[in-house]
Each structure stands twice: as structure tokens, then as C-alpha cells.
Amino acid sequence: MKHLFLLSVALFAAMGADAADVDVKSPDGKLVVSVSDDGGMPGYKVSYDGTVMLERSALGLKTDIADFTSGLIIDKSDESKIDKKYEITRTKTSAVHYTANQLDVVFKKDDGKKMKVTFCVSDNDVAYRYTLLPIEGSDYRCAVVYSEASSFNFPGKTTTFICPQIGPMTGWMRTKPSYEEDYTADAPMNVKSAFGHGYTFPCLFRIGNDGWALVSETGVDAGYCGSHLSDYAEGKGYTVAFPDKGENNGFGSACAAVTV
């Protein structure tokens, strides 16, 4: 299962980890991701050069196998290095040299069911994805993902440059959402989205005078559903939201089916 979220960070100007946190740093040591299981709930936070860019934010999936949003502990973690080069056409950069540090964190429930979260941290970017691990002694080989707990909880001073998601089967020839709605620059986070459906990726945030963060999904193929961000919730931030059931004229499911 691959559902990758990208948090790209740029800092203008200059956090320690809790004792139980598992940390991974960028190659230059400035970008730090701290992963924890506080209260049985998986989460992470991001700082850059000592400045908090993302407060503790939720991780996890609700599936037909188990609820991987609570009742979890960190079972193990492994860190490795990534250093690869590749070329790509039709982009602004044709030759890419990607270096990052990777952290695999396995969360476990009391009954032994496990979820792995893989973080890749380069000098300016954080990406993560989920993997549901095989269940020993069971016949589970696939799962339905009902929803994600994945959230982005920015500091309170953050303002937004984000496009509201509009309802399905509206607009010209009932083609919306077409991801072309107007947005307000530098808007406060606690203002409801214009249509009550959250916001469309990519989403740009300004963390006061400390820097900027761009949030988007990437690496999503036909094996998973596209998503967007929910409206802001105090203390939780923005949560990953699945498609509206009315999209695509009601055909198909708004959930995701994945292999285990």
C-alpha cells in the first residue's frame, strides 16, 4: 500500500524530542521529525533548525481489519539512508540527486496487528506513507481503508493560501470538483472553507515569519483514492479526507482497498 504525503518546508530564520519519541533528521541535520505513541495514538511533529513547523499531528488508518488510530505502541523502528539519481523529462529539473534519511516505524496493537509508517526526510522535505503488515497466522491479504487520521496541525499563527473543495456534480456540465475555485490569500486557519468540503491539494501555509510549508499527496495511483484536506479543527489541524460519495456520479466507492 502506498499513499504518500509530502510536507515541503522553507524557513526564513532558528525542539527537542520527548523521551519516548523516535527521531529522524535530514542529511544536513536541520529538519527533524519526531514520532511517538502518546496515549496509544500514533503521531509526529516537525521542526526545522529548532523552530516548530508542525505541532504534534495524528497518524493512522481505520480499516476493516483493525482501527490503527488508537491502542497502539511503537514496536520497533529502523533507520536507513537514501541516495539516488534519476532523470525525468517535462519538469523544471531534469536531473535529480535525491538524498534523505528514511525511518520505518512499526506500530502494534494488543492483538499483534501492525501498521508501518515510513518517513523520508531530505533537507527541505518530509514524506510519509503507510503499509499494513501481514498478520501472522491469518488469511488476511487485503483490507478496506475507511478513513485516515493523518493530520497536519500547524502552529496557531499560521495563515493559509488554500483552494476550497467544492461539492460534486456541480458547475459547468456538472464536472466539479474541478479544483479551480477562488481562494483568499493569507487567511486565518479557523475560517470555514467556502463550500464546507475542506480544501484541495496542494495546500500552502505560512507559519508566521518562521517560514512556509506546502502539503500535498503524491505517488497515488489506481490502487488508492485521491484525497483532500478537511476543514481546520482546533487542536487537530487539517485531516486527510477521502472523496465525496457523490463524485464520479456515484460510481465506485469512496474508500480504498489495499493489499496486506
Model-derived segments and spans:
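N-terminal accessory beta-strand-rich subdomains and adjacent acidic, glycine-rich linkers
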Residues: 21-260
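Hydrophobic h-region of N-terminal signal peptides that target proteins for export
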Residues: 9-17
